[in-house]
Amino acid sequence: MARITVEDCLEKINNRFLIVQMAIKRVHQYREGYDPLVECKNKEVVTALREIAAGEVMPADSIEEAGVFLPATK
């Protein structure tokens, strides 16, 4: 597979700091038992970045309401 970077995710999310926070939150979700939304055999952080670049996870309108971004289904 091709390499994935934060720059690849900037097409979907215009804030690189939010992208990093989203990826961290997503890795925590994997460790809590959530399934990945894209097929990827890389490390968890790479899988999270692939999900963001694919538009599978998006930031929530209200961070207080939904955490850092809209949760994926379990």
Swiss-Prot record:
- Pfam families cross-referenced by the UniProt entry: RNA_pol_Rpb6
Note the coiled coil stretches, chain numbering.
Answer: none
Q: Which GO terms describe its molecular function?
A: DNA binding; DNA-directed RNA polymerase activity
| Taxonomy, superkingdom | Bacteria
Q: What are the record keywords, sorted? A: DNA-directed RNA polymerase, Nucleotidyltransferase, Transcription, Transferase
Q: What EC number(s) does its UniProt record assign?
A: 2.7.7.6
InterPro entries under this entry?
DNA-dir_RNA_pol_omega, Pol_omega/Rpo6/RPB6, RPB6/omega-like_sf
Catalytic activity, reaction form: RNA(n) + a ribonucleoside 5'-triphosphate = RNA(n+1) + diphosphate
Q: Note the Gene3D superfamilies from the entry.
A: 3.90.940.10
Q: Which GO terms describe its biological process?
A: DNA-templated transcription
NCBIfam families, alphabetically? rpoZ
What does the subunit section of this Swiss-Prot or TrEMBL entry state?
Answer: The RNAP catalytic core consists of 2 alpha, 1 beta, 1 beta' and 1 omega subunit. When a sigma factor is associated with the core the holoenzyme is formed, which can initiate transcription.
PANTHER family per UniProt: DNA-DIRECTED RNA POLYMERASE SUBUNIT OMEGA (PTHR34476:SF1)
Regarding protein family, the annotation reads: Belongs to the RNA polymerase subunit omega family.
Put simply, this protein is called DNA-directed RNA polymerase subunit omega
